[in-house]
């Protein structure tokens, strides 16, 4: 079965709401329309569906096939196009744990709906993504639960001797694939080991694996996140050779340089930069903050570009650099935590339901402080004229930078794309950070964005916040991403 190359996600990093949305914050029915739109008009071959939050719709398959019959008759869901469920991780997200079971129970129902629609056996959903994977046990529990309790219940006998299968019918598909999503430092360093343990003893010929790019940037800095992705991709290549199982890495990219720098106009650069990745995510900003023709062209390139081979990497040298850089990055974030949280209150939402929880609950903890989620965090810092990509940069020596450029050739491009939106006069941009990136880059600042951030800073200083959200959106519109 063909593995998708371009996964549309529901990450709310867009400035502009899509034309089909009833209001700026997308609700449940909007997300049904969105799934159809990305398949039929934009050309994505996969939609990730977050199975969490108050507006989650477990009847997404039925609604898609009912509302858009003509399209889905010609494009078989589960074969030509994928709908991939992102489930809660009960090990971390205790409050959402039982949603996992509800979601797994919905898979056979979707199978029945699709089989009736197509007049043949059809599995529209047969994979789930497990966030915050930290061990093979987390993956095996889901795989086993489906086999033993969802599929397995058909063998149970009721009081009158009738089996569940005879009474209700067969439960299909017979098994599901579990895609591990690695989101933190330890998870990425052990991603190949955990995946190998999960594969052990199973008759699996192909396995998808997923690397986060956004949350690691927030927790450890952009350079750390990129280097951790490189290590994991290299390790996956080695595991593939050792195990004989074909691996298909997915990488979660946003449009802000801090969160991946994937835009319709730089697909070739980013796919080459992340050689070894097979599937790339396109988040809301990619889809809705650019001309539709450019978006379609970008997605077509994503789907057609030849996957590269992950490069070798000097693991110990990389980890030494990450350690020093991350320490300085976190120190600088701590210095800004109060103003980040203050501005975050005015960053507009773009989805009605809460999305996945992530590493530290709905807010990010760093020591004894809480921070907003990655998109809001990024938007808040850009609004202050302090692109988060620049934080911690002063910790790197010229020797470090030479080494990093060999492993991460796009470093200069990503920093340049970010630094143009810095405000060199911002009181929140430290002198040591400013001098270090100006020496490295000689940036050309965006005058319009600088002027808007000055207005934001002035409004905060005099506590006149009535139009702060409007100014934050104005700056975001100039960048073509919210956060």
Swiss-Prot record:
Family designation: Belongs to the PEPCase type 2 family.
A biological-process GO annotation: carbon fixation
Coiled coil (residue ranges): none
InterPro entries linked to this entry: PEP_COase_arc-type (IPR007566), Pyrv/PenolPyrv_kinase-like_dom (IPR015813)
NCBIfam families cross-referenced by the UniProt entry: PEPCase_arch
Function: Catalyzes the irreversible beta-carboxylation of phosphoenolpyruvate (PEP) to form oxaloacetate (OAA), a four-carbon dicarboxylic acid source for the tricarboxylic acid cycle.
Enzyme's top EC category: lyase
Effect of pH on activity: Optimum pH is 6.8.
Native organism: Methanothermobacter thermautotrophicus (strain ATCC 29096 / DSM 1053 / JCM 10044 / NBRC 100330 / Delta H)
Name the record gives this protein: Phosphoenolpyruvate carboxylase
SUPFAM superfamilies: Phosphoenolpyruvate/pyruvate domain
Catalytic activity: oxaloacetate + phosphate = phosphoenolpyruvate + hydrogencarbonate
Sample GO molecular function, one term: magnesium ion binding
Chain residue ranges for the region called Disordered: 1-20
Source organism superkingdom: Archaea
Keywords noted in UniProt: Carbon dioxide fixation, Lyase, Magnesium
Entry EC no(s): 4.1.1.31
Temperature dependence: Optimum temperature is 62 degrees Celsius.
Quaternary structure and interacting proteins, as annotated: Homotetramer.
Swiss-Prot/TrEMBL cofactor(s): Mg(2+)
Activity regulation summary: Inhibited by NaCl, KCl, ATP, ADP, GTP and aspartate. Unlike E.coli, not regulated by acetyl-CoA.
């Amino acid at each position: 079965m063909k593995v998708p190359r371009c996964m549309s996600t529901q990450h709310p990093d867009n400035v502009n709401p899509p034309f089909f949305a009833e209001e700026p914050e997308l609700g449940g029915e909007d997300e049904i329309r969105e799934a159809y739109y990305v398949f039929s008009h934009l050309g994505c071959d996969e939609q990730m569906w977050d199975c969490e939050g108050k507006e989650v719709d477990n009847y997404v398959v039925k609604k898609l096939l009912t509302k858009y019959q003509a399209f889905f008759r010609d494009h078989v869901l589960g074969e030509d196009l994928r709908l991939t469920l992102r489930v809660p991780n009960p090990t971390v997200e205790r409050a959402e744990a039982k949603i996992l079971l509800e979601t797994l129970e919905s898979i056979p129902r979707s199978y029945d709906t699709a089989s009736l629609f197509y007049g043949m056996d059809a599995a529209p959903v047969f994979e789930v993504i497990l966030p915050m994977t930290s061990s093979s046990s987390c993956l095996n529990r889901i795989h086993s639960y489906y086999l033993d309790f969802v599929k397995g219940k058909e063998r149970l006998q009721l009081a009158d001797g009738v089996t569940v299968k005879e009474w209700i019918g067969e439960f299909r598909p017979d098994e599901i694939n579990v895609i591990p999503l690695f989101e933190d430092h330890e998870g990425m360093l052990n991603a190949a080991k955990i995946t190998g343990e999960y594969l052990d003893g199973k008759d699996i010929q192909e396995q998808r694996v997923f690397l986060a790019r956004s949350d690691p940037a927030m927790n450890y800095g952009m350079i750390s996140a990129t280097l951790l992705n490189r290590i994991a991709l290299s390790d996956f290549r080695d595991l593939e050779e050792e195990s004989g199982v074909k691996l298909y890495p997915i990488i979660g990219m946003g449009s802000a340089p801090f969160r991946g720098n994937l835009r319709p106009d730089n697909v070739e650069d980013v796919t080459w930069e992340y050689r070894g990745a097979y599937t790339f995510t396109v988040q809301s900003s990619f889809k809705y903050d650019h001309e539709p023709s450019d978006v379609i062209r970008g997605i077509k390139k994503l789907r057609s570009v030849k996957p590269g081979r992950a490069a070798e990497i000097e693991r110990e040298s990389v980890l030494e650099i990450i350690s020093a850089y991350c320490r300085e990055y976190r120190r600088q974030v701590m210095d800004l935590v109060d103003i980040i949280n203050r501005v975050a209150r005015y960053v507009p939402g773009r989805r009605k339901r809460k999305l996945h929880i992530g590493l530290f609950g709905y807010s990010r903890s760093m020591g004894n402080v809480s921070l907003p989620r990655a998109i809001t965090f990024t938007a808040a810092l850009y609004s202050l004229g302090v692109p988060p990509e620049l934080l911690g940069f002063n910790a790197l020596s010229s020797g470090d930078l030479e080494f990093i450029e060999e492993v991460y050739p796009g470093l200069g491009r990503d920093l340049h794309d970010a630094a143009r939106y810095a405000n060199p006069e911002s009181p929140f941009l430290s002198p040591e950070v400013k001098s270090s990136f100006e020496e490295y880059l000689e940036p050309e600042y965006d005058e319009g964005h600088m002027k808007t951030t000055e207005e934001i800073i002035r409004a905060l200083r005099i506590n006149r916040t009535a139009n702060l959200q409007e100014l934050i959106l104005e700056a975001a519109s100039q960048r073509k991403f919210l956060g």
